């Protein structure tokens, strides 16, 4: 079997742990690959150079049997984009993390235990979490685990656009706003929360629609996870659709964007995160 490792860039703790993990995994007879950035960082440091395994682009991590993310939620989202349906286990390096459940001091033993379980049974112990697919006329973005944002070219005075939001063909809201955000429960603690959207427990089967500087004062709405959400963007020179804050598509209004549950969920491996314990770190 093959384990992929993606470590947070410019973080010595993450690279040191990645080096240790590479050494331990070799003792289990598992093959190890790291993403190209991690390989470069390990190779540039004398103490870690011997641990450098094969490297591969993050987009090829789906060929692994397990992917390990070491860092924060941003690193996890980056790794998850390439992992596809491959189970992914997140190691949290201390900041508020709602996707990374494993403490660094427990990481090596937890990963080794999961690898041995896969070697013995042929599959990982996982929990499926929905992702979002945003698409338009002849285009679609890579799936988002946290949120999809649709907005005008810029925010603030003189920016934004007219936004019409439909849920399963029924009009929910219409008017001027900076944009609209559609989040999964997993992403409710991220950008959604900063836009005054609600916290939603990750086990709830729903999607969250939150207006961004919405002049209509429309409250956020939680809909069924299988709802189809359509955002019509007009009255703006340009707009943008963003998946998990990283992958973006520039659009020219009028544009009709569909956001719905992606066909392939993310599969979380390892012990589950205690949601309410993680919430304490937000205070």
From Swiss-Prot:
Lineage: Archaea, Methanobacteriati, Methanobacteriota, Stenosarchaea group, Halobacteria
Cofactor(s) needed: a divalent metal cation
Gene it is expressed from: nadK
EC numbers: 2.7.1.23
Subcellular location(s) of the protein: Cytoplasm
Single GO term (MF): NAD+ kinase activity
Principal localisation: cytoplasm
Catalytic activity reported: NAD(+) + ATP = ADP + NADP(+) + H(+)
Function: Involved in the regulation of the intracellular balance of NAD and NADP, and is a key enzyme in the biosynthesis of NADP. Catalyzes specifically the phosphorylation on 2'-hydroxyl of the adenosine moiety of NAD to yield NADP.
Pfam families attached to this UniProt entry: NAD_kinase (PF01513), NAD_kinase_C (PF20143)
Name of the featured protein: NAD kinase
Binding-site list for NAD(+): 73-74, 146-147, 157, 176, 178, 189-194, 213
Annotated catalytic residues: 73 (proton acceptor)
Organism per entry: Haloarcula marismortui (strain ATCC 43049 / DSM 3752 / JCM 8966 / VKM B-1809)
Cellular component terms (Gene Ontology): cytoplasm
Keyword GTP-binding: no
BP term (GO), one: NAD metabolic process
């Amino acid at each position: 079997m093959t384990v992929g490792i993606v470590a947070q860039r410019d973080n010595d703790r993450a690279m040191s742990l990645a080096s240790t993990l590479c050494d331990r995994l070799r003792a289990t007879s598992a093959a190890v690959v790291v993403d190209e950035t991690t390989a470069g960082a390990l190779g540039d440091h004398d103490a870690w150079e011997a641990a450098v395994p094969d490297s591969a682009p993050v987009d090829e991590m789906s060929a692994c049997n397990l992917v390990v993310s070491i860092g924060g939620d941003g690193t996890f989202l980056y790794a998850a984009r390439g992992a596809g349906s491959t189970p992914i286990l997140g190691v949290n390096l201390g900041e508020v993390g709602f996707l990374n459940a494993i403490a660094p001091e427990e990481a090596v033993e937890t990963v080794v235990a999961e690898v041995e379980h896969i070697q013995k049974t042929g599959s990982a112990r996982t929990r499926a979490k929905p992702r979002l697919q945003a698409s338009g006329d002849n285009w679609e973005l890579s799936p988002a685990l946290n949120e999809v944002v649709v907005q005008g070219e810029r925010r603030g005075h003189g920016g934004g656009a007219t936004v019409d939001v439909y849920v399963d063909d029924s009009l929910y809201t219409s008017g001027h706003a900076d944009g609209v955000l559609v989040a999964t429960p997993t992403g409710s603690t991220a950008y959604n929360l900063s836009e005054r959207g609600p916290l939603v427990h990750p086990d709830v089967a729903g999607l969250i629609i939150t207006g961004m500087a919405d002049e209509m004062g429309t409250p956020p709405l939680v809909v069924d996870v299988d709802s189809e959400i359509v955002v019509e963007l007009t009255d703006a020179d340009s707009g943008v659709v963003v998946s998990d804050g990283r992958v973006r598509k520039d659009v020219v209004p009028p544009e009709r964007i569909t956001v719905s549950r992606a066909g392939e969920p993310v599969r979380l491996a390892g012990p589950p995160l205690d949601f309410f314990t993680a919430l304490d770190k937000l205070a």
